[in-house]
Amino acid sequence: MKFSTILLLVCPTVALSAQYALACTETGRNCQYSYECCSGACSAAFGFCLHR
């Protein structure tokens, strides 16, 4: 592959990863799933993001 093709594939991947990291839910906020929380831990019993 050419360098420009590799660059074209890598740039959107990096941009989407950064957007996902900024879109996470803060500790103490409501959540349903662990992947929604910045810490990666959602309380099943109470439904809020836990700290790690």
UniProtKB/Swiss-Prot annotation:
Coiled coil: none annotated. The lineage of its organism: Viruses, Viruses incertae sedis, Naldaviricetes, Lefavirales, Baculoviridae. This is Conotoxin-like peptide 2. It comes from the Viruses. GO terms for cellular component: extracellular region. Residues 1-18 form the signal peptide. It comes from Orgyia pseudotsugata multicapsid polyhedrosis virus (OpMNPV). InterPro entries: Toxin_18. Its main location: secreted. The gene is CTL-2. Disulfide bonds join 24-38, 31-42, 37-49. The presence of a 'disulfide through disulfide knot' structurally defines this protein as a knottin.
